[in-house]
């Protein structure tokens, strides 16, 4: 099946030789399995129900999504998490103290969904809130952290997204509430990734790791938008808005703890039931830039579109193996902006093999030319330059070259 299952008793790094054979020949690859206390050594990849479906999530939707991600190749490229967002539970907690699953949406329960996903090589994420009620007004986990954490573990949950609606505004109170749930998750017999979602209002990059977090939102909710001011239509932020928020936070990203600039909006195309607000969405070029920038920033890659029905352009963006490899590079370094010009940016991300990923972004509505050479980017080697989007080598780049960018376009190169 290609799915490796099992348990390891002792910590350590284990080497496994994998062999593949078909009519074209045979190949081997060494797989390193790191076993230790730290989770999420690379940014999580997967899918979340919120951006397209909002409150309209069901068991059937989750299972169909998993099947689609197997068929279209997403699972095999690392999109492992399938995350249930708000509205899986009833408004009121049960008399026995447990959260009640909405059986009209999940008639066979959450464990059934988890088992279905695990059998196919996926992991299950779930959602709750550090208050009595979630953002949608259904049952939250405040005061019942241990009970809920045990339930999540017994169902087979692998990730908890923990929101902060209807909770105290202060940083100290937020840290206390997140620390309590983080401690409850660690007390279970299951490794559960803890996703902290308080929208960056209390600088979680400075404390989230201390309370057990593995990723933390740095901004308000993303919209299916390229750029907009926050006072429009619910305060949703555009892709460029969030890019600016996350840009100065690179020092806080590392294996086991990631800045989270929110989920991907690639391919939504204005069809969201939760974040679209009748938006027409972005162009394919803007979606391509969005994905490239999130890969450069070592961001979580959690898709929010309907993966059951994607056009070729969306699929091509999300299945770019080279961009995914940049995102999943084991060094875990978030790209830093090397050049901020009037109309364009140049971003640099060191990679584990000694090469560098270079991203050139056009921020304006007209074309831009960017000159790249050893003088414009310090320490840049141009012996071999690979165009990640086009999937080809750049000819005659040893002394530098001109990168031509269409409006909103981002091109990425690997330079050795």
Each language-model region and where it sits:
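Strand-loop-strand motifs at the edges of beta-sheets in extracellular beta-sandwich domains
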Residues: 1-9
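A short beta-strand micro-motif common to beta-rich folds, especially ectodomain repeats
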Residues: 12-22
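C-terminal edge beta-strand
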Residues: 25-36
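An acidic-aromatic substrate-binding cleft motif
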Residues: 34-59
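C-terminal beta-strand-rich structural cap/linker in extracellular carbohydrate-active enzymes
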Residues: 396-416
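Glycan-recognition surfaces
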Residues: 144-147, 193-305
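Aromatic-lined carbohydrate-binding/catalytic grooves of carbohydrate-active enzymes
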Residues: 51, 65, 69-171
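Carbohydrate-binding surface patches
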Residues: 288, 294-297, 302-304, 340-378, ...
